[in-house]
Amino acid sequence: MKMILFFSDLDSTLIYSGYPEHTCVEYNEAKEVTYMTAQGINFLKDLLVRKDFVFIPCTLRSYEQTARIDFLKNGNVPIIICDNGFSIYENGILDKTWDNLMKENLATYPTDEIKSDIEILVSSNNMCCKIKNNRNAFFTLIFENAESANMHYVTIAKVLKRHKYKLELQGRKIYIIPDFLDKVLAVKYLCKKFNPSLVITAGDSSVDKSFVEEGNQRIIPSHSSLNIRNTIITKKSGISAGEEILDIVMSLLKNQKLNIK
């Protein structure tokens, strides 16, 4: 049986922070983190029970952060792409073949040097932020708020421009990522492995652009700044766009079934 793969970013695509009037789908130490609409949750539940359909989250998050999300617990979603494509987990187990390939690519990058440069940069500029090392693959600077992250972005970019790293600003976080590392690499790897009949993709930010373009059917929320040709754009924005994306996926699956007949 041919599989249909749905690769989707999570934050600001399917799940959203700042919507306490909706259903919380993620807690961190009893604190509410992200939300979905009740209808969006129902759509996702309906999708996850299909035998011909595989939902594969594709996120900048670590595995530990991703595993906090309710619908990703208890084996409901067997495959997860984490760490901006650096890590693939299947049934909670790291894909060693993929991991070795990524580590080979990373070996040419001065991770210890850039880690030192980041620490010096933060200290010398009195930046009030937390430095997070993501499997030694990339680094995250977590500021108190988005304003602080914006204020320091240019300084960080100037200091780190000699390295083969790219910067991604998202809210109060600045991601410092090796230029080779892209979610699309993991997406292509899994598509080759499963040879799906249909690939659906969804994402909202610049780190999603390449993998969204890999889809036969591509969806982006209307609040996204992405500009991709031949893409379905939701009519709604914010958390309602997450619900609409899942509704669109269900419609695409229905049409796929009709076309097969």
Where are these regions (language model features)?
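Mg2+-dependent phosphoryl-transfer enzymes with acidic/Ser/Thr/Gly-rich catalytic loops
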Residues: 177, 184-261
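Conserved acidic, metal-coordinating active-site core of Asp-based
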Residues: 119-214
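Short glycine-/acidic-enriched loop or helix-start segments at secondary-structure transitions
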Residues: 17-18, 66-69, 91-92, 210-211, ...
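Glycine-rich, phosphate-binding/catalytic loops in enzymes
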Residues: 22-26, 73-75, 218
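Active-site neighborhood of HAD-like aspartate-dependent phosphohydrolases
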Residues: 2-6, 10-57, 66-67
